[in-house]
Swiss-Prot record:
GO biological process assignments: negative regulation of cell growth; positive regulation of myoblast fusion; regulation of cell population proliferation
GO MF terms held by the record: cytokine activity
The keyword Disulfide bond is annotated on this UniProt entry: yes
InterPro entries on file: Secretoglobin_3A
Protein name: Secretoglobin family 3A member 1
GO cellular component: extracellular exosome; extracellular space
Cellular location(s): Secreted
Keywords: Cytokine, Disulfide bond, Secreted, Signal
Chief location of this protein within or outside the cell: secreted
Entry comment describing in which tissues the protein is expressed: Highly expressed in lung and prostate. Also found in mammary gland, spleen, pancreas, testis and liver. Detected throughout the airway epithelium in lung, with highest expression in large airways. Found in lung submucosal glands where it localizes to acinar and ductile cells. Not detected in respiratory bronchioles, alveolar ducts or alveolar epithelium. In mammary gland, specifically localizes to luminal epithelial cells.
PANTHER family, alphabetized: SECRETOGLOBIN FAMILY 3A MEMBER 1, SECRETOGLOBIN FAMILY 3A MEMBER 2
Organism: Homo sapiens (Human)
Length: 104
């Protein structure tokens, strides 16, 4: 059971990382004409991605009984209090831990 939870966590983290990479590396497209822009905004609600709200990490944590909303609120408070320098340090630490787990 623990192995399945670990595998699910690894898949969820890799999916989130891959999605963040793809979103960050996407090239900006040309701006639509002003007349089409309002139509695009009106249709955005009807054509929303049904899987856009599906977050595998949230599903995994909530299936394990971990309160996800409480974790999200706490992390948002920490980020707001610490500022951008601390966020950069946490990202660097996360990258270092990721490298250690790959080579360790």
């Amino acid at each position: 059971m623990k192995l399945a939870a670990l595998l699910g966590l690894c898949v969820a983290l890799s999916c989130s990382s891959a999605a963040a990479f793809l979103v960050g590396s996407a090239k900006p497209v040309a701006q639509p004409v002003a007349a089409l822009e309002s139509a695009a905004e009106a249709g955005a609600g009807t054509l929303a991605n049904p899987l856009g709200t599906l977050n595998p990490l949230k599903l995994l944590l909530s299936s394990l009984g971990i309160p996800v909303n409480h974790l999200i609120e706490g992390s948002q408070k920490c980020v707001a209090e610490l500022g951008p320098q601390a966020v950069g340090a946490v990202k660097a630490l996360k990258a270092l831990l990721g490298a250690l787990t790959v080579f360790g």
